[in-house]
């Protein structure tokens, strides 16, 4: 498999000879307003440019996976540039309805037993923050596990914090590669929305032999954990050899 960090949560996964585009936010730097109740209110999103052209990103894509419909995972540019007949996977019927309303004709809801071109796609749980108020505000999210006889097991956790269900997913699926959204993006009033460094350390402790790739970093205004801080923390805690913190455009092959 090959995993390319594009920007924020947008990644390209080549797995069992198929190309998946996950959580496409494809706008130019500074297109959108800041998120409310967050730091850096003077900056527009995304904070950085794409590392390559949209044509390069879309070239040869077999399917798109949208873990949830927040702007930094599925934006207006993605809705406009993606072919309307491309295979789209979403987390539930509500998201399917919205994606279809944007003109997409080949939309499927992920389940535990979804299969695409011989690749098993297992929908996994997630919680987009902590506390009832924040969870109600942020709405449902998912991750997914990729499985195929010719590949290692890949777990893409999505927009979630560490909690017991993530540990359960790791123990159930025994992933060898885990992609976490690790920028510790926060609301000033309600706290962390995704994983911070301590969450990522818990992922490592639950899967000590897995390679962890941390994405969703330094690309939208409400990030609080930098790549540099995460790298330093992983050295302090002794798991730097297990974690990869890609720059935008960087690729890994497993």
Swiss-Prot record:
The keyword ATP-binding does not apply. Keywords: Hydrolase. It comes from the Bacteria. Its EC number is 3.-.-.-. Transmembrane segments: none annotated. It is an enzyme of class 3 (hydrolase). Coiled coil: none annotated. It holds the Pfam family Lactamase_B_2. GO terms for molecular function: hydrolase activity. Belongs to the UPF0173 family. This is UPF0173 protein YddR.
């Amino acid at each position: 498999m090959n995993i390319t960090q594009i920007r924020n949560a947008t990644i390209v996964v080549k797995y069992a000879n198929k190309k998946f585009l996950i959580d496409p936010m494809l706008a130019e730097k500074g297109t959108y307003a800041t998120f409310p109740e967050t730091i850096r209110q003077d900056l527009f999103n995304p904070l950085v440019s794409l590392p390559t052209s949209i044509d390069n990103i879309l070239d040869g894509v077999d399917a798109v996976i949208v873990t949830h419909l927040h702007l930094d995972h599925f934006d207006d540019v993605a809705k406009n540039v993606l072919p309307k007949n491309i295979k789209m996977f979403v987390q539930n019927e509500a998201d399917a309805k919205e994606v279809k309303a944007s003109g997409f004709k080949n939309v499927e809801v992920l389940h535990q037993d979804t299969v695409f071109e011989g690749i098993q796609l297992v929908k996994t749980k997630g919680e987009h923050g902590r506390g009832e108020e924040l969870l109600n505000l942020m709405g449902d999210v998912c991750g997914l596990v990729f499985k195929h006889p010719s590949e290692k097991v890949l777990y893409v956790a999505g927009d979630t914090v560490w909690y017991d269900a993530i540990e359960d997913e790791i123990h159930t699926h025994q992933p060898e590669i885990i992609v976490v959204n690790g920028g510790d993006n926060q609301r000033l009033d309600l706290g962390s929305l995704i994983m911070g460094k301590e969450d990522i350390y818990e992922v490592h402790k639950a899967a000590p032999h897995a390679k962890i790739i941390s994405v969703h970093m330094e690309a939208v205004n409400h990030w609080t954990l930098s790549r540099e801080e995460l790298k330093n923390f992983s050295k302090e805690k002794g798991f730097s050899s297990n974690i990869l913190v890609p720059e935008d455009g960087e690729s890994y092959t497993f």
